[in-house]
Amino acid sequence: MPPRLLELAGAFGLQVHRISVRNQRWRWGSCSRTGHICLNWRLVQMPASVRDYVLTHELMHLKQMDHSPKFWALVARACPDYEAARQWLRGYARNPQGTPATS
């Protein structure tokens, strides 16, 4: 994951200062104001498109720290299919032992 994060950061003209991968229970990732991005190790189990969305989401926090409309506009520009990835994550959260639950 860190190599892909750095690849995406370069494509977006962003600089990540530190990357860590952890066993997080409630978050897929986080980004600090100092450029430290922390990722959940479980991302490796997810489809590449979902993983890329999470990485992109965290990278966009380097431009906009909150989840304001401006932030979501940045995410939408960088990852046009982000809604599908968010839906997948919601399904995974309901059924983490297997494939996402469908409604």
Regions found by a protein language model. Give the residues of each.
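Active-site-proximal or metal-binding-adjacent scaffold patches in catalytic folds
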Residues: M1-Y53, L62-S103
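Walker B catalytic acidic pair
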Residues: E58
